[in-house]
């Protein structure tokens, strides 16, 4: 593609590469979904079919390394980078083990130069990496795995519980998915730092966001910016009229939902987030709140606290659809939450897990201006305080660890 002397030749190799990458992803991840959906559509008009479906295990992390490859090809096509002649360097870029199965989604322009330069051991970088790994393990093992036990129990049998308990289950899943995914990202970034590699940041305290637009600038940052650079902007971005902005916003959120999995729940989840962000797009306020909340202050204002609470509730509502097994379950789950049973005493109230969540959120708030929460320990804290904190976190990992749960994003 790079050496093609004609535009048509360049386009041929470009679209061939795009087709091969997306073809593998579509075949393994979406074939059964489309086959079943097509059969359901035919049954509505009276035709009964038994579609052939795949009985294969989805390759772990296929959505992530497919996007690595796509960004590489697109950047070459746009003349942002030159093709990598060293096959080993290219292979490491696509399959660097810390990010292979669950991201972050790297760019060739960011990672390849780091792989090609000579690296030297950096004690400060190593120490910082170990701290981030420690915090990631705490988030995954202590918060996410404990929340998962109760979230799974409630979501698997929603008909057995009152609306108040279903709300508790939704809150548990809200913290589970954040601590599970951001915990993995912390471990990946910390591990890469041990090898002298700086990966893209993937989370920036999203639950302290004051609106949905800010939330999506802070949640799964590598995916959000990927869709912005390789889909939203090529579609015209925000340069066209209001209708173009609305259309492009819906496209990226629907595609983002579909990227997560072959289930209508993910597509509806993407559409919900597009609806939530639409008032900000229409009013031109989607670029507000670029800095972290309460910058340089310990406490937020009442207005900021209210905005964070409202955004958190909208996010929790969307996570219900994301977690549900199907659209019918999501609808019944939400309908029951907004029934009179919401005002009953919850049947599931694990005080120990709730206390752990509160402590966790206080630490996150304390360190929200840093790349990760406990990075602040290395800035001004005396050595005895730092080591006491590290050992306390390590002890919590062993003492308060929940039942082992697979990382949620391994399925994507």
Give residue spans per PLM region.
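Membrane-embedded transmembrane alpha-helical bundles that form the catalytic cores
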Residues: 1-411
